[in-house]
């Protein structure tokens, strides 16, 4: 594959870039780039103005599709350096409000809700799942005031145990963490450097999520808080061998199943953050000639230092070209388990409860009236 970097914008082709940085991440729904080059006075730069549509290609393979965000010009008497940056079309979903007539859906799937919210932004939804659980319809789904499209769809995705990301075509993708290993990174061969960090400061032996269940009686009754605070879920981390409990208070009414899923998500998220690999790879392409991209499952072999791992997920990729680093790829990797999304109900839309009142308000009111009964985990 050629390493030629081509920016297509405003019906023109821009090449010859001397500095390149293209980043895509499984934890972000928008890839982004920054390109730089020195140009002589009089160069027409109108096609690189902020707001212009673009397609960025490397060796003919698309790596980013969206809109130019910024253009910077640094000038001397004889030359000018221009730096252009942009993001995928899906960036608008992060920045902008979720707007839909009526603000709610009934008996619609996550895919259908996503298509409705993405349509005004010209963003295509790619659904890569076939299981019944992820495709189950929501009895009801309601937008929060002022939430963005991204925030609304994250909430819906968690309720279906789905990973939401984007691809190089600027599409919003619903998928799951890759399960088949593709490449092996061998230190001293295709792997130039490896930074392996294990940090257990934010990991705990047990995660307990406590929630609220609606008690019998009318609002204003002098009921015992113990009859209200009755739902909980627990997840454990067998790698943390000493006693390190963590308690999380749910922000709304929750079932035991939801509490269990929330505890598991917290355990997995902290696992992924605690064991990380930062690797530098020679070149931009994998063994099959394709560019490095997120959501690939790889192995690392640094046997010289007694490190050999399997099932590491590529969570972030940055393709780099500059005078200091040359041409290389930086990748972030973490255990695949940390990117498995447990199913959580959409608590806001469960019948009889919401996130701005209901049982939460009742509990808080009870403790305001009876501060002596406030449990330690609420102090």
From Swiss-Prot:
SUPFAM superfamilies attached to this UniProt entry: Phage tail proteins
**Residue segments, region Disordered:** 344-379
Which ranges are annotated Basic and acidic residues under compositional bias? Answer: 344-353, 365-379
PTM statement from Swiss-Prot or TrEMBL: Cleavage of the C-terminus gives rise to a shorter 40 kDa form.
Q: Name one Pfam family in it.
A: GpP-like_1st
Recount the UniProt induction comment for this entry.
Answer: Expressed in the late phase of the viral replicative cycle. Expression of late genes is activated by the viral late transcription activator C.
Q: What happens when the gene is disrupted?
A: No tail is synthesized.
Query: Which GO biological process entries does UniProt record here?
Result: symbiont genome ejection through host cell envelope, contractile tail mechanism; viral tail assembly
Gene Ontology CC terms: host cell cytoplasm; virus tail, baseplate
The principal localisation class reads virion
What keywords are annotated for this sequence in UniProt?
Host cytoplasm, Late protein, Viral baseplate protein, Viral contractile tail ejection system, Viral genome ejection through host cell envelope, Viral penetration into host cytoplasm, Viral release from host cell, Viral tail assembly, Viral tail protein, Virion, Virus entry into host cell
* DNA-binding span(s): 209-228
Q: Where in the cell is it found?
A: Virion; Host cytoplasm
Q: How does it assemble?
A: Heterotrimer of one uncleaved (42 kDa) and two cleaved (40 kDa) forms. Forms a hub-like structure with an inner diameter of 25 Angstroms through which DNA can presumably pass during infection. Part of a complex composed of three DNA circularization protein N, three baseplate hub protein gp44 and three sub-complex wedge (made of two copies of each baseplate protein gp46, gp47 and gp48) that forms the baseplate.
Q: What is known of its domains?
A: C-terminal region forms a flexible domain.
Q: State what this protein does.
A: Forms the central cylindrical hub of the baseplate and plays an important role in baseplate and tail assembly. Core component of the initiator complex that triggers the tail tube polymerization during tail assembly. Forms a conduit that probably functions as an extension of the tail tube allowing viral DNA release during ejection. Might facilitate the interaction of the virus with the host cell surface through electrostatic interactions during virus entry into host cell.
Q: What is this protein called?
A: Baseplate hub protein gp44
Organism of this sequence: Escherichia phage Mu (Bacteriophage Mu)
Top-level taxonomy: Viruses, Duplodnaviria, Heunggongvirae, Uroviricota, Caudoviricetes
